[in-house]
Amino acid sequence: MTEFVPLTWHDTLYLAPELILAAMFLILIVTDLILPGRTNRAIIGWLSLAGLLLSLAAVIWRMIDMNPSGVSAAEAAEAGKAISLLGASYRVDDYGNLLKIIFLIGTSLVVLLGLGSTQKDDAVTDKAEFYYLLLPAAAGAMIMASSGNLVTLYIGLELLSITTYVLVGLRKRSSLSAEAAFKYVVTGGIASAFVLFGMSYLYGVTGSVSLADFPTALPQAFTDYKALVYVGFFFLIAGFGIKIAAAPFHIWAADVYQGAPTPVSAFLAVIAKGAALAAVFRFLYSSAFFLTGGPGKQAGDDVFFALLVIAAAAMIAGTVSALRQKQVKRLLALSGVANAGYLLVPIAISVTIIHSNNFSEFVFYLVAYLLMNVGAFAVVTVIARAAGHEELKGFSGLYYRAPWTAAAMLIFILSFSGLPVTAGFFGKLFILLGAASVKAYWLVAIMVVSTVISYYFYFGIIRQMFMRSNGEEEDRIHVPAVTGTVIWICAAATVALGVLPGPLMKWIDAVFTIQADLFVR
């Protein structure tokens, strides 16, 4: 069993990104209490953004330190070793670092999106708690990405969950928000119970909560406790399936996304979903993956096949359910169900000699998904302000009233659709080629068919923007500078990755290694 090693002051330097967020969270609570009631709470938003960027800088600094240039291969390997803290319960490695960068950038864009909104839009972005609650939520996502045992993983999951429960229900005067908060708390509680129940079974059969012990303990336990191992894994899959809104566990998503403030919906769509996927990725490759080569081979194969089935179901259910949607946030929620399926594919096809770069595919598409989702939700805030609602008809004649915003939304729609030249095209292509390389042709067929079907509702938005008129073409839509900045950061990055995907993929492959960064030893 892994021995517990006390945390030293030197070790806290490795935890700087998380500690920065924790310290800023406490500072902002006190600041909010002492500020006069009439003071604009946007200052809390800007301070939250500063804390997120400072944490991001700390993560990047750690990555540079772990991946030095101009040194020998032996020195580079030594510098790149994962750093285990608190008895391997928390890891600092390039797997976690890459995902933390995504989570922090995504949360920063959500804060900017909130700063670009007004009280009229969501009735929450003038409240300080909207901004500072995003900090512990981001910290929870980061903890999930770096967890080295089941306890740490669950703590990160609950930190993320509890803060998002509050964020979803911040619009106290909105019946939709109250309904969304209730549904999210109930389904989130069920998901947490499933995850904890599954963890308890695996702890019971292995005698350890450390992921470092699972590669040896789990195959041994499988011989005597085959049924319990199956139960543990499938409760965990069901629990995380609810968290990522993958079919058939996705029923809550549309109502919650519709009722939540738009920036919160963007956070749930990207950071909350990405954190759960990151946890599944690391957990399965520290447990079920090691069953595939021993007496538990059938169980390991069954776990990964179950993920493939869920991925396929998510792609089909999300796409079909979105066909008749007229409410844009509900449409984006159901689109997110389908995209959860795409993101599960690199995890579920497993690492083989033939196909070993599934993490690169996962990260690339997660980045593409972040950009097109946050950008699309930013456009929704603009439309909702102008039209007074979030229906699809609000996009009518957008090209004539805000041509640059319409152009940006066109980029996001093309990326969602997986068409050139956007990040979504290469993201889906890399995942499709990965599935084809392991001969999962049935899954390739489902990916292609679901993508083609999705053109109907994605192009419906394009048709509204460019081919429909609401008779108010002379009424120009005002786009706040901060919101416009978010939209064009996302649009420019989406096109850049669609034109030059190679540099990002090569960089991920250069800093990430399966043995050192994914497997917990």
UniProtKB/Swiss-Prot annotation:
E.C. no: 7.1.1.-
Top-rank taxon: Bacteria
Transmembrane annotation, as ranges: 15-35, 43-63, 98-118, 128-148, 150-170, 185-205, 227-247, 261-281, 303-323, 331-351, 363-383, 406-426, 442-462, 485-505
Membrane topology category: Multi-pass membrane protein
Gene Ontology biological-process entries: ATP synthesis coupled electron transport
Protein's job: NDH-1 shuttles electrons from NADH, via FMN and iron-sulfur (Fe-S) centers, to quinones in the respiratory chain. The immediate electron acceptor for the enzyme in this species is believed to be a menaquinone. Couples the redox reaction to proton translocation (for every two electrons transferred, four hydrogen ions are translocated across the cytoplasmic membrane), and thus conserves the redox energy in a proton gradient.
Summary of subunit composition and partner proteins: NDH-1 is composed of 14 different subunits. Subunits NuoA, H, J, K, L, M, N constitute the membrane sector of the complex.
Name of the protein described by the UniProt record: NADH-quinone oxidoreductase subunit N
Organism whose genome encodes this protein: Paenibacillus sp. (strain JDR-2)
Taxonomic path: Bacteria, Bacillati, Bacillota, Bacilli, Bacillales
